């Protein structure tokens, strides 16, 4: 029997995708070989590669103004590639909403970029999304869409005339997005859209001009990968294959509007369970900024019970509920692949646990 996996990433995958990958692992489409064994230059793999890119654009409703790049190095490499490629001679503005924006700021500073933190919620242990106004003449404005550790999420992105950069790693492909002022939108795919080893970057083509004539190593230059259709070097072929299956699955769900509707229902059920616990459970994030993806909470009346909660949950068939080491507590990551019945199972366990130990 499969466990209910609430891990923050790598995370649970739809069973249909795992079963299809299992079926095709040794014999892809009856061809007598695995997709992992063939050259990335073959037509067979190119169909997967380019098909995945087109499906990703279709899900977000993007036209040819955007390039889709498949890169390695995780989202963390983007912390350096973004300022390397997109910083000009002005100020790069960041909103600091958690660990991942702090890391991005640090990488830009290492590169000698003129970085300004224009908003931060660090003084309240990142329990909310701070109000932010970016200057129109900044080189770019940078935000993290969803904060995996602290359980906060932008309900709407800031409106700005300067190019907006969005790290969407932990709410990738979970809802429709207004791209009207987004210049670069990226994430590692291992939370909501595949397995580890692949990053997907949507970059507006006019931004690629900034990479021209810069002294950047070829592998770190967005233009290199755009001009070579993300095939400059050997890509992570199996991760791209799995990403392609995820794109098919999302389209079969009815697209991102339907996925968002389901995600909203799941989150509402879990937050209601916390809010109606008479203070036994307490969420970390302010209600207005609660994440639909990561629900971080404590056993407020006795935090010593939290390891027992995790242990008993595992015995009941639920894994990945231990909070991040920085924040502690309990965290349920309720990504796309989890269904409403699985959230209901968690809520029933939470009520039973409260009944035993309140």
Swiss-Prot record:
What are the GO MF terms of this UniProt record? O-phospho-L-serine:2-oxoglutarate aminotransferase activity; pyridoxal phosphate binding
Catalytic activity entry: O-phospho-L-serine + 2-oxoglutarate = 3-phosphooxypyruvate + L-glutamate; 4-(phosphooxy)-L-threonine + 2-oxoglutarate = (R)-3-hydroxy-2-oxo-4-phosphooxybutanoate + L-glutamate
Q: List the CDD domains.
A: PSAT_like
| Enzymatic class | transferase
Q: Which GO terms describe its biological process?
A: L-serine biosynthetic process; pyridoxine biosynthetic process
Q: Where are the N6-(pyridoxal phosphate)lysine residues found in this chain?
A: 191
- Residues given in the record as L-glutamate binding sites: 41
Top-level lineage group: Bacteria
What SUPFAM superfamilies would the database entry show?
PLP-dependent transferases
Q: Which co-factors does it depend on?
A: pyridoxal 5'-phosphate
Tell me the route in metabolism or biology where this protein functions.
Amino-acid biosynthesis; L-serine biosynthesis; L-serine from 3-phospho-D-glycerate: step 2/3; Cofactor biosynthesis; pyridoxine 5'-phosphate biosynthesis; pyridoxine 5'-phosphate from D-erythrose 4-phosphate: step 3/5
Q: Cofactor comment in the record? A: Binds 1 pyridoxal phosphate per subunit.
Subcellular localization, as worded in the UniProt entry:
Cytoplasm
Which GO cellular component terms, listed alphabetically, does the Swiss-Prot or TrEMBL entry include?
cytoplasm
Q: EC number(s) per UniProt? A: 2.6.1.52
Please give the subunit comment from the record.
Homodimer.
- UniProt family annotation: Belongs to the class-V pyridoxal-phosphate-dependent aminotransferase family. SerC subfamily.
Q: Which NCBIfam families match?
A: PRK05355.1 (NF003764), serC_1 (TIGR01364)
Q: What does this protein do?
A: Catalyzes the reversible conversion of 3-phosphohydroxypyruvate to phosphoserine and of 3-hydroxy-2-oxo-4-phosphonooxybutanoate to phosphohydroxythreonine.
Q: What is this protein called?
A: Phosphoserine aminotransferase
- Top-level taxonomy: Bacteria, Pseudomonadati, Campylobacterota, Epsilonproteobacteria, Campylobacterales
